[in-house]
Amino acid sequence: MNVRAAATYLSDRYYDPLMTASRAPAEPTVREFEATVERVDDREVVLDETYFYPESGGQPADRGTLDGHLVDGVVERDDEVVHALASDGDVDLEPGDEITGLIDDAFRTYCARAHTASHVLYGAARRTADDLGYAGFDISETKVRVDLTTAEPLGDGDLIELERLANRAVWDSLPVSWATHSADEAREIDGIAFNTKTEEGAMSGGDAVRVVTVGAEGDPWDVAACGGTHVENTAEIGPIAVLERSNPGEGVTRVEFAVGPTAIDELGGVHAAALDAATTLDARVGDLPDAVARLRDEADRLEADLRDAREELLGARLRELPTTEIDGARWAVGTVDDAEPNELRDPATEAVGSDDDLDALAAVGTGNAPFVVVAVTDAADGDAAAAEIDAGEVVGAVTDEFGGGGGGGPTFAQGGGLDADPEAVAAWLRER
């Protein structure tokens, strides 16, 4: 077998060697069956045999009815499959009754397709990721997740390749088969590896292991120990759409994907979005990356021009602030509208540095959160008056008087959260 070496896709049912009392995994196409009631405990029913799949290993329980009674849940307990009936209505079943079980065809079909799709996706990951391992699996109403451990995080390109390879495996109509082996026999299958946790106890001795093979026996797409229900050919899966990825833990990449209507809607939505974007950018869909790159470059240039223009505007506002003499130094003090403190650092420093008659500047920002910035001419330039001013000390005095907090150095400091009218703060600075 040419399955790329990787940790086998294993069910979460580590307590059981992937065998179940249900006949569903062995005969997944059965939707109606006859059985005898063995035991009834309140609303829980045990049959002599069942084709209902019990919730296990990330695959949800089958839905359906037992002689018209809605089955609300199915679990395996003490090597028995227990059917929990819905709470509405009386349970008129008794031990010895011959009953008919009906399995919800749509939901079983969805789960089988989704479960096989997860094996197909894992097979694709075998061909794209190094040091691949399996960390979890779950089927929900609209999507499936597979948790992979990889040497490096999976990127966008990896997801695209996973989706491409998985859909190619679907198109290639690969057979899907399953067989039961002893644990020792299973270990000898090329390309299959057992999780250490699985090997401890449950996988020892002559325990039976159910092995699912996707593809031809001599050259399979994937080989996995699994107890779920599956389709008999990958063509039955239909389109596979990768939805997103996340990182739930160190070294783990969670890949979420969809099959069926959700996948069709996702792929159609992506195509529609691409067409809309292409129309907006006057480009072909295949040329979108280049068109977006050009647009991004243009946006970056415009943003830089806007920053420069705004800095010039703020500088002009600061140079228009009224000046006053405070302790022998020439100050520009006033309020500034529509500005953020970080935006004023360079314009304020430039304003005091370019005016030989100005020693310091204090600008009070208006708005819901008043702030103050103070810039002082560098004393190294020979300004004796500026040498007596410490911007950080001035901001500290402002926050002591009006609340808030801040800090900085001798030539520039800022403070925010002032609990006062900006004009009152500016007046206090002029008079201090």
State where each predicted segment sits.
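A glycine- and charged-residue-rich anion-binding loop/surface
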Residues: N2-R432
